[in-house]
Amino acid sequence: MSFTLVHLSDLHYNAYPLHWSEWNFKRGLGAANLFLKRAKQHPLSRNRKLVEKVSTMDWDHLVISGDLTQLGLEQEFEEARRDLEPLLQEKDRVSIVPGNHDRYVQDPEGQDSFDQYFQEFFGEDEIHHRNLPCGWELIGWDSCHPAPWYSASG
């Protein structure tokens, strides 16, 4: 039996904080890095071409492992969801695991944008487990959490 697994990683959808409540020291540093360097390394046009390509393929399961976003902003998650939507139609064929940039800082209102936009592809537990039709087992671990301003770890 043939089984095609597609794995995408480090898409880094990026945007700059629009509202004062989204700014903090860590996001300020991240936005400066984005402006000076990262936006050139992670052009959004590349992500759209990637989605187009994968849309034309005959795949059995799609895994997207973080980082979906650069600064963990809601508008980044919104854009990622909108762009990836053609690939997300069959939820039982998609698994998405967050990365450290997806849990970049503690949201002042206690919201988790990853969960808001992509939890249905991971679940509520720290460990995501799925039995794939080919007999493989897919296990994803969400070890990410907001880290202090001086740390990029999650």
Region annotations inferred by a language model:
Residues 1-77:
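N-terminal active-site segment of His-dependent metallophosphoesterases
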Residues 78-154:
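Extended active-site neighborhood of metal-dependent phosphoesterases/phosphodiesterases
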